[in-house]
Structure formats: C-alpha cells, structure tokens
C-alpha cells in the first residue's frame, strides 16, 4: 500500500487515473488508462512564496491550492476568467496575428488546448513558445519579428499580472462587503 500512496502523490497533480497493475509485487500505474489532465499551471508558481496571485498562471492562491478538488464547472469558470484576461490584454497587443496560422503552429508544437480556448489563450501559447525560442516568431502566425518577442512578452506579463491582481483585489473587496452586510443583518435580527 505504501507504494500506491507514493505513486498517487506523484501523479495526483498531473494525471487522472483509474487503474494500477501489479508488477513484481509492486503496484504501478497502468499506462493504458493514463490521461493527462489540463491545468492552467505555467510551471513557475509564485503562490508558494506568498503571492496572492500566481505570477505564472495568474490563478488566485486558493485556486492553485484547491484546483484538484474543484468540479469541472468550477475549473471552467476559472479558465474563462483567465482567458478573458488574455483576450483583454494580448489580443490588442498582437493585431496582425493570423489565428488559423497560430492554431496550426501551437498544435505543431504539441501544446494541448481546451476545446473552448479563447483567441487570447491561443495567442498566449504561441507567444510563450516564441519567448522560449525567438526563432519561431516568423512561423508562429503572431505577425511579429523575432526581435519583438521579448519586449512584447515583458509588457504582456506586466499588464496581465496587474489585471489579475486587480481582479483578485476586487473579488476580495466584494467578499469583504458581503461579509459586512451579513454581519450587519445578523446583528439586526
């Protein structure tokens, strides 16, 4: 049983699984039933250092912590908020992007996208690939040159993080206001 628990911890964040197989008296995850789960994680979570909003994926800290406990509907709500932020910031920054070309480029790099991924999400994935290797800029469909990748990425990161933090602050203020009203109503009764 200890080996199963260890394997569960290793795969719980990245894999949804149904089944183990037994090999040489040990339980091992069966590759036949493994399905990679899709999360907004960008692989550089800053919430572990105390940030309220992750600098990588821009989820709120409680969303990062509880992601695997959320229902698909709750996860979709979060994805939509994140995609709306990408649409608001990135789409105007890349006015010459050819979406069909971008989609083909992203798929050719084996990046998985949700079926309902927004235009901004697709542009983000392409720009992220180019940020790692600016030589892909010309083939990306983003309508930018390789020397533009870094400045666009840096400005995008600055703007989208500011928007995500403002979104968090607004959500916190709303929750605080609702809390105060509930306390006031309870005191009146």
What role is predicted for each listed range?
Residues 2-95:
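N-terminal cysteine/histidine-rich coordination modules
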Residues 5, 86, 127, 174, ...:
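Generic low-complexity, intrinsically disordered sequence content enriched
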Residues 14, 20-23, 30, 70, ...:
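Generic signature of intrinsically disordered, low-complexity segments enriched in small/polar residues
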Residues 42, 76-83, 100-103, 107, ...:
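Generic detector of well-ordered alpha-helical segments enriched in charged/polar residues
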